[in-house]
Amino acid sequence: MATRVEEAARGRGGGAEEATEAGRGGRRRSPRQKFEIGTMEEAGICGLGVKADMLCNSQSNDILQHQGSNCGGTSNKHSLEEDEGSDFITENRNLVSPAYCTQESREEIPGGEARTDPPDGQQDSECNRNKEKTLGKEVLLLMQALNTLSTPEEKLAALCKKYADLLEESRSVQKQMKILQKKQAQIVKEKVHLQSEHSKAILARSKLESLCRELQRHNKTLKEENMQQAREEEERRKEATAHFQITLNEIQAQLEQHDIHNAKLRQENIELGEKLKKLIEQYALREEHIDKVFKHKELQQQLVDAKLQQTTQLIKEADEKHQREREFLLKEATESRHKYEQMKQQEVQLKQQLSLYMDKFEEFQTTMAKSNELFTTFRQEMEKMTKKIKKLEKETIIWRTKWENNNKALLQMAEEKTVRDKEYKALQIKLERLEKLCRALQTERNELNEKVEVLKEQVSIKAAIKAANRDLATPVMQPCTALDSHKELNTSSKRALGAHLEAEPKSQRSAVQKPPSTGSAPAIESVD
């Protein structure tokens, strides 16, 4: 019998789970709403568990008192079971709150979020219909299981065993509920810690954004300064090139003038050289002529000497002739001397002309030296300009190096920005993982709450069965009214016991689902 009751409860729980899963697919709540609903439901479950512990002892005493009366009422058993099953359904309709019914109907009907909520009367009617269907099936299964037993003692023994099992299960469920409450408190603490870390990450993000903005502003100022410096350098370079071009043009004009003057001087020098050559040739010709004259005079002297020798021989014979010839020769000698002096004077004049030509040549050399000095000064100015140009080129190289350094700094800042963006993305990924963990924990909590509600319904059904058996045992109306009050208490207590019973499969599921949660624990540690 106990196995059949458990199978019926499992079938009821499977249907409720399917309905809740369908309700989840149709309607989703925000994490904050789920958290608030879960805390309220857990508070209600805790209260029901306390009431169940208080009522367990009173129910056991009532069962012992009514054993004798139940033994006598076996004849009217079947009719009373059917009547009390319907009465129990109607009583449970009144006990279930309309809000719970609406919530259960929303969870069972997929896509109920999109529909508008009907009025309270329609909600009650729908809840009652659903309850009649589910509870009627379970009551019929329990009654069939009890009908298989022959004697009422066996039925009572089976019910007592089932009740003891339910008590043990309720205690275990209470323990599990305490463990789950502790886990929930830990999860809430972790959630608060994660929220604080999220706020810290947002602050860090805002700081990084402000730093990026400051860097962009600094980069803009650096770019503007570099552009201004480049413009100033270009203006300076243009001015220097213009000044250099003007000086080059002036120097070229001076060089052209000097070339023209040098050409004139060269022509004059060529003409003077030709004149000097002509004078030298004339002087050479005159020297040759003078040499010839001297040779001729030497020959004449030789002839005179020969004549003198002859005359010496003929002195004696012709002293008169000799004297005459001597006078004649003296005259010729004086004439030749006069000619010699004239030739000397001509030579002096020619030497004077040569000195004049030499003076002119020296003046030409002085003019050439002056032109060379001007050329050297021009070369010095050119060297100065080249030095200035080299200095300007060095300055441009320095500015280029500064600009390259600034570009390198900008690239480094951009790399740092990319690294920080990667860190920010990693933090976002960690936050998404933590949000997934929170969602998974919330879904587990919702599943546990739904299972607790299913167990509550099972306990209420079992309480209805016990109340039906008690009504069969008591023929008098007064004990029946007392039993009704006990039934109401039993329903509340057995709901709590049902919550404990549902917590066992949930704990098993959580144990099955713990590996992914433990896998997510290193992610939380990495965030810390």
Swiss-Prot record:
Biased composition (Basic and acidic residues): 1-10, 104-118
Entry annotated with the keyword Transport: no
Keyword list, A-Z: Cell cycle, Coiled coil, Cytoplasm, Membrane, Methylation, Nucleus, Phosphoprotein, Transcription, Transcription regulation
Polar residues compositional bias, start-end: 508-520
Span list, region Disordered: 1-36, 102-130, 486-528
Induction data: By bacterial lipopolysaccharides (LPS) in Hep-G2 cells.
Primary subcellular site in the record, as a coarse category: nucleus
Tissue spec: Ubiquitously expressed. Expressed at high level in heart and skeletal muscle. Expressed in brain, placenta, lung, liver, kidney and pancreas.
Molecular-function GO term, any one: DNA-binding transcription factor binding
Modification type Omega-N-methylarginine: residues: R12, R24
Compartments, record wording: Nucleus membrane; Cytoplasm, Cytosol
Pfam hit, one: Taxilin
Residues recorded with modification Phosphoserine: S79, S86, S97, S105, S517
Cellular component annotations (GO), alphabetically ordered: cytosol; nuclear membrane
Similarity annotation: Belongs to the taxilin family.
Miscellaneous comment: Depletion of TXLNG by siRNA decreases the percentage of Hep-G2 cells arrested in G1 phase.
Subunit relationships: Binds to the C-terminal coiled coil region of syntaxin family members STX1A, STX3A and STX4A. Forms a heterodimer with ATF4 in osteoblasts.
UniProt name for this protein: Gamma-taxilin
Organism: Homo sapiens (Human)
